[in-house]
């Protein structure tokens, strides 16, 4: 009789060995040198009852610091936002949860329509013409946007703001290492925004694209209109890495002439967990549609006139063109894209706007409380993040804050020595006045 977790009897094993012409398990591994074979049983404890095992696992899990046990002011790309309850209920349906790339439209209409709706929502938020079905994360989307710019313009220089997420810049440099001819020029900051004079001076006729973040990594809102004016006559592309929740309130990049808008939909329905998985989005203009990486779902009609959805423009993709594909991305984040679509749909246009307003209001309240406490808060018009200077190392402050069940902000000294002892603080719609007041009070005590 087989074990409940190991569904093989000795008879099963013998039948399998006989089928492949081996006399024993040892003969099966005969090609493996004997000195690296483990010639004993694994040192594994005996099995436990499920109730006992659950108690043990819960005891281990209780050691974790989570946003359920602590109040989080940590952002830097991953945020603690409200997710409607309907999100988990919908994405747990088996037809979505287990679905793979819907190559066969006749049996994948639900999945295809869900992706189509995601693309539509992204286009509406960004004010762009076309969006793909998703990317791995915002960093991947950004790097792919830069590669598209090189390909489209046939130029080799890209000008990027140091206000971009430092990990997005790292991914770009990793991509660029495989293309020796590509030059990445990083523009310094003026406070917490891009130094526009240096940016303007760096843009020339050899520039493939200019890339900025909106709001940027330090929480400040860049002047997209001014930046776009620097590149209008240079035939360079304008790439904007944007927080999609902020676009519920801020003027979308497409309205400022952006050619490609990328980002991460984590703020919509995707929990903050271990650094992933996330869901990158990629939106662009009709002119660049045939160079978009990843899947595109289009709306069509069948031979009976019924509306249907299919994967379209597949000649761009690596399963068709191999080494000549616009990108090597294959599987995407369709389940997380669905989660974001459901969250956006449940909130609606007004709901997204209201939450965006709450983020600004709560962050501004927190700013004022830090200023009243005597902290230096760096200037800059912000959305839901801002930078505060401390007298003590941020790591030390954060270690002490945890004792009060508070997860402090991001240590910017990790990114640059210019921001040593500076904390990037995120304040979302979920943070209450009492939570903010307690955070500021404890931060003040620890900074003395």
From Swiss-Prot:
Its EC number is 1.4.4.2. The glycine cleavage system is composed of four proteins: P, T, L and H. In this organism, the P 'protein' is a heterodimer of two subunits. It comes from the Bacteria. Keywords: Oxidoreductase. It catalyses: N(6)-[(R)-lipoyl]-L-lysyl-[glycine-cleavage complex H protein] + glycine + H(+) = N(6)-[(R)-S(8)-aminomethyldihydrolipoyl]-L-lysyl-[glycine-cleavage complex H protein] + CO2. The gene is gcvPA. This is Probable glycine dehydrogenase (decarboxylating) subunit 1. GO terms for biological process: glycine decarboxylation via glycine cleavage system; nucleoside metabolic process. CDD domains: GDC-P. Transmembrane segments: none annotated. SUPFAM superfamilies: PLP-dependent transferases. One of its GO terms (molecular function) is glycine dehydrogenase (decarboxylating) activity. The glycine cleavage system catalyzes the degradation of glycine. The P protein binds the alpha-amino group of glycine through its pyridoxal phosphate cofactor; CO(2) is released and the remaining methylamine moiety is then transferred to the lipoamide cofactor of the H protein. Belongs to the GcvP family. N-terminal subunit subfamily. It comes from Staphylococcus aureus (strain COL).
């Amino acid at each position: 009789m087989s074990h409940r977790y190991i569904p093989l009897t000795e008879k099963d094993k013998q039948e399998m060995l006989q089928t492949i012409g081996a006399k024993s398990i040892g003969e099966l591994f005969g090609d493996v040198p004997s000195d690296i074979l483990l010639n004993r049983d694994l040192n594994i404890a005996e099995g436990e009852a499920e109730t006992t095992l659950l108690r043990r696992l819960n005891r281990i899990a209780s050691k974790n610091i989570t946003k359920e046990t602590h109040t989080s002011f940590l952002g830097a790309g991953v945020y603690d936002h409200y997710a409607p309850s309907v999100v988990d209920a919908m994405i747990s349906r088996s037809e979505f949860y287990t679905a793979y790339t819907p190559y066969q439209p006749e049996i994948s209409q639900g999945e295809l329509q869900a992706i189509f709706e995601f693309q539509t929502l992204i286009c509406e938020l960004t004010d762009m013409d076309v969006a793909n079905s998703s990317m791995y994360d915002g960093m991947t989307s950004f790097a792919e946007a830069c590669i598209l710019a090189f390909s489209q313009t046939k130029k080799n220089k890209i000008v990027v703001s140091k206000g971009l997420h430092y990990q997005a810049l790292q991914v770009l440099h990793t991509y660029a290492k495989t293309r020796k001819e590509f030059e990445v020029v990083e523009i310094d900051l003026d406070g917490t925004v891009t130094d526009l004079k240096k940016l303007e001076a760096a843009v020339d006729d050899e520039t493939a694209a200019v890339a900025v973040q909106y709001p940027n990594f330090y929480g400040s809102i860049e002047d997209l209109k001014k930046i776009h004016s620097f590149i209008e006559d240079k035939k360079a592309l304008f790439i904007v890495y944007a927080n999609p929740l902020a676009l519920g309130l801020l003027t979308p990049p497409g309205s400022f002439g952006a050619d490609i808008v990328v980002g991460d939909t984590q703020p919509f329905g995707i929990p903050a967990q271990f650094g992933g998985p996330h869901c990158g989005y990629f939106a662009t203009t009709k002119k660049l549609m045939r160079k978009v990486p990843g899947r595109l779902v289009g709306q069509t009609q069948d031979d009976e006139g019924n509306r249907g959805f299919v994967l379209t423009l597949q000649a761009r993709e690596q399963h068709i063109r191999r080494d000549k594909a616009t990108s090597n991305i294959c599987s995407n984040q369709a389940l997380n894209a669905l989660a974001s679509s459901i969250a956006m749909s449940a909130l609606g246009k007004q709901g997204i706007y209201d939450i965006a307003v709450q983020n600004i209001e709560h962050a501004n309240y927190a700013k004022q409380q830090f200023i009243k406490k005597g902290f230096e808060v760096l200037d800059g018009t912000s959305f839901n993040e801002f930078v505060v200077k401390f007298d003590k190392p941020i790591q030390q402050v954060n270690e002490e804050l945890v004792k009060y069940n508070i997860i402090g902000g991001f240590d910017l000294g990790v990114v640059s020595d210019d921001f040593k002892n500076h904390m990037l603080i995120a304040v979302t719609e979920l943070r209450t006045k009492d939570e903010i007041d307690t955070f500021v009070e404890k931060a003040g005590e620890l900074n003395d």
